[in-house]
């Protein structure tokens, strides 16, 4: 297989970490092979979608046999570049930010929060979950264009001004947990995660589209 990564749909790309996590669990349990139906039941993605997702990468399985767990795990580790650590900076060491620092993506081998920023003098100079907390005034000095990803858990009113500073420091991706909708250059990728909206959506679907028991 060529070392060049195939171009795949963004929806497929978002599901790859889900597949990878389940395969890691299968491998840990000693399972040698898995069918698309078993994968479907575990990750709640229909079998046809799984087979289509996998088809973008060529022949990963055999009809009637399923997929070799070790092979798939190795393949997705390379595809997701699990052996290369991406360093992340977190902004806003409140309740949510603190939770992120204590968790620090312990189930992921390829992402790690290495520094955090806040304006609260009582937090500056401390460490949370082993991660040093710096004053926001030190942003440019500390980032120096070396950190590609930022997580924002700051107040919404501060999000855009902070984003503008991050762009000048070479940030390529932002995971935005604020309600603010950020304006960024076209080469910057932003994923918005509004927990309040997600909760409202869940309640709406529970009320209006109940699942059969």
From Swiss-Prot:
Report the locations given in the UniProt record: Cytoplasm
Q: Which UniProt keywords apply?
A: Cytoplasm, DNA-binding, NAD, Repressor, Transcription, Transcription regulation
Task: Tell whether Cytoplasm is among the UniProt keywords.
Answer: yes
An example Gene Ontology molecular-function term: DNA binding
Q: Does the keyword Transit peptide apply?
A: no
One cellular component GO annotation, for this chain's record?
A: cytoplasm
| GO terms, biological process | negative regulation of DNA-templated transcription; response to redox state
State the oligomer form and interacting partners: Homodimer.
| Family to which the UniProt record says this protein belongs | Belongs to the transcriptional regulatory Rex family.
Q: Give a short account of what the protein does.
A: Modulates transcription in response to changes in cellular NADH/NAD(+) redox state.
**Matching HAMAP family, A to Z?**
Rex
Q: Per its UniProt record, what NCBIfam families does this chain match?
A: PRK05472.1-3 (NF003989), PRK05472.1-5 (NF003991), PRK05472.2-3 (NF003994), PRK05472.2-4 (NF003995), PRK05472.2-5 (NF003996)
Q: In its UniProt entry, what is this protein called?
A: Redox-sensing transcriptional repressor Rex
* Organism, as annotated: Geobacillus thermodenitrificans (strain NG80-2)
């Amino acid at each position: 297989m060529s070392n060049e990564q195939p171009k795949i749909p963004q929806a497929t790309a978002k599901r790859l970490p889900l597949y990878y996590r389940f395969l890691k669990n299968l491998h840990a349990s000693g399972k040698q092979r898995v069918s698309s139906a078993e994968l479907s039941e575990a990750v709640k993605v229909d079998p046809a979608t799984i087979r289509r997702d996998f088809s973008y990468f060529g022949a990963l399985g055999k009809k009637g046999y399923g997929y070799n767990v070790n092979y798939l795990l190795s393949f997705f580790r390379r595809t997701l570049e699990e052996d290369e650590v991406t360093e992340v900076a977190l902004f806003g060491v409140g309740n949510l930010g603190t939770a992120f620092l204590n968790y620090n993506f312990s189930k992921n081998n390829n992402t790690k929060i290495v520094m955090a920023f806040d304006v609260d003098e009582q937090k500056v100079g401390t460490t949370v979950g082993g991660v040093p907390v710096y004053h926001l005034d030190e942003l440019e000095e500390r980032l120096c264009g070396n950190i590609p990803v930022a997580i924002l858990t700051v107040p919404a009113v501060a999000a855009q001004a902070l984003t503008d500073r991050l762009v000048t420091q070479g940030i390529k991706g932002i995971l935005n947990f604020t309600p603010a909708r950020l304006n960024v250059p076209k080469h910057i990728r932003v994923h918005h995660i509004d927990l309040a909206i997600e909760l409202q959506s869940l309640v709406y679907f529970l009320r209006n589209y109940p699942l059969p028991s």
